[in-house]
Amino acid sequence: GIPIVQTLKESLTGNRITSLEGILNGTGNYILSEMTSKGVSFAPALAEAQEKGYAEADPTLDIDGFDTAHKLVLLIRLAWGVDYPYTKMPIEGIRNLDKMDIDFAREFGYRIKLLGRARMRDGKLEAGVFPTLVNHTYLLARVGGAYNAVRVEGNAVGSLFLHGLGAGSLPTASAVLGDLISIARQNNKLN
């Protein structure tokens, strides 16, 4: 996965984060990318994601937005130090999108992306997960396949964009290994 956790924990500690948004689930993005690029409906795109090992046999967490919501909760905790349960946010997945939705968006110059979004507005945190119309010229609209991307807005750094492979065995193994090394380093500091 992309190094967003370490970025928020270490690199952006001198910033006041104002917003973050991103494609936090590579499986969902792969499905939407297939629907957009190949003109297929949801079911064949999901079947292909499963065949390639991007989607689980039971893809509920990915396609209903809950995996994105769980990741967004973690990013909110790191960015604002707030415990924000996913049950508090609106969550809508991509299960009910069809080819007509994709075609309609494209006709008007948009792509549909499953985004997790959070922002601090007037001292109040707003967050949610939903399929979003994204202008085709915007960076997030150009993220295809099983890739993830996160845009973070900070008062000092401005806009920061991180992008990388987000589904499959290698990115998952890389993220787990990175977490284990981070934990081991932290334990060494404590001893």
Predicted regions and their residues:
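Rossmann-like NAD(P)H-binding beta-loop-alpha module
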Residues: 1-55, 65-67, 74
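Conserved active-site and cofactor/substrate-binding residues in soluble primary-metabolism enzymes
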Residues: 3, 15, 37-44, 63-71, ...
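Solvent-exposed alpha-helices and their adjacent loops that cap or buttress functional pockets
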Residues: 10-16, 22-24, 38, 119-122, ...
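A short glycine-threonine-serine/GTX helix/turn-capping micro-motif
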Residues: 18-20, 56-63, 162-167
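Short helix-capping/linker segments at secondary-structure and domain boundaries
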Residues: 38-41, 79-86, 182-190
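Substrate-binding/catalytic subdomain of NAD(P)-dependent oxidoreductase enzymes
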Residues: 46-149
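ATP-dependent carboxylate/acyl-activation modules
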Residues: 138-191
